[in-house]
Amino acid sequence: RLSVCGTVNDLASMGARPRYLTAGFILETGLSTDVLEPIVCSMAETAKEAGVTIIAGDTKVIEGKGGLYINTAGLGDRAPDCEISAGNLHGGDAILVTGTLGDHHAVILTERMQMKTTLASDCAPLNHLVEALLAAKLPVHTIRDITRGGLATVANELAAASGVSITLSEEALPVREEIKALSGILGLDPLTMGNEGKMLIALPAAEAETALRILRALPYGTEAEEIGCVSTGSGVHLKTLYGGRRRILPLRGEGLPRIC
């Protein structure tokens, strides 16, 4: 599922409608077909959900201990007048997220630590959310899927690319209570924890409520929130619960665990 969603969401973040995927499998010797078959079926189901077709594939077998690697590439089409890009943030834009932060990262971590929780991965194809916003003719400026490095890293990359400042509201950040508790215990920051089914979306503040209404009416967008704004300046800052303001830096080094 992740191999399909990752590529579909990358295309959607560019304002493109995903159409076709190719898949390459590197299989280690000893891999059981009982393991491989459910994975392939999951890919097929996810591709169907996203409305894309897997049109080509290849396999290679290497020495190993029964593991596998999957690589996908995708093709999509994008309207000629689409201006969605990382460097297109404007002063006065509202910053939205399509749902809660850190879910996938937390699930991978708790699984590896053999901790029992009720958390579930948010891995999902998000292209239908983007298509709905564009179908409504909303002037979306920037979209980015929030993956490795979390919201902090994504926001810093976008602010730097656009030459603007982003201010986030701590009060508005959607984070599950379980993830807040886990973060407190392990010394993690939900802002640097990755997702595989969430997006940051920027558009004029006057259109934010319309965009939220559209997102919340669709699967994978029911918990969408407006979390910040764009202004002149540089960097990313957080307005804290106590009225303070602090600088948010991107994740340094390699985030652990690796989420993809």
Regions found by a protein language model. Name each.
Residues E28-G30, L119-N195:
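Active-site-proximal betaalpha loop/short-helix elements
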